[in-house]
């Protein structure tokens, strides 16, 4: 499905929206059933290079105690999530786009997939990144 069709579907109203929601529920129940899946949130760093005024971890906020979890701490948390049947984890940090940071996250993703036999889903929330990243 292309982007234009998705946008059109999301903009539906009235009976068409009702039918869309009904169909989406049918697909969801067929694919994953009527279940709840746990997702672990791993806030591994609050270091950020941006200065967004709305954000509590913005670069200029000197009242924040900064932290950056070790790779072992992150991998241990992911292993815990996998051992306890979490469907996925979110790796979240402030926005950093340096090459060492990108390399670190790339290595973590590979190790998480390895330790979970490629079973643990991963969502990244590390701010805006370049298309190539």
Model features per residue range: what roles?
Residues 2-7, 17-18, 54-56, 85-90, ...:
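Generic detector of short, locally flexible boundary/turn motifs and exposed helical patches
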Residues 59-74, 81-133:
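Core AdoMet radical
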Residues 5-6, 21-33, 55-65, 118, ...:
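Short charge-dense sequence patches
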Residues 1-51:
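Flexible, acidic/Gly-rich N-terminal and inter-domain linker regions that tether
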Residues 30-84:
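Active-site cofactor/substrate anionic-group-binding motifs, chiefly glycine-
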Residues 5, 53, 80, 131-132:
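Non-transmembrane, interaction-prone segments in cytosolic or luminal domains
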């Amino acid at each position: 499905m292309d982007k234009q069709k998705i946008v059109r579907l999301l903009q539906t109203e009235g009976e068409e929206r009702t039918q869309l929601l009904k169909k989406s529920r049918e697909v969801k129940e067929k694919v994953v059933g009527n279940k709840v899946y746990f997702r672990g949130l791993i806030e591994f760093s609050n270091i950020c290079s941006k200065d967004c005024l709305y954000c509590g971890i913005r670069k200029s906020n000197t009242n924040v105690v900064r932290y950056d979890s070790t790779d072992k701490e992150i991998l241990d948390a992911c292993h815990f999530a996998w051992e306890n049947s979490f469907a996925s984890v979110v790796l979240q940090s402030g926005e950093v786009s340096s090459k060492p940071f990108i390399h670190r996250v790339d290595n973590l993703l590979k190790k998480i997939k390895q330790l979970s036999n490629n079973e643990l889903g991963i969502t990244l929330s590390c701010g805006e990144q370049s298309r190539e990243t």
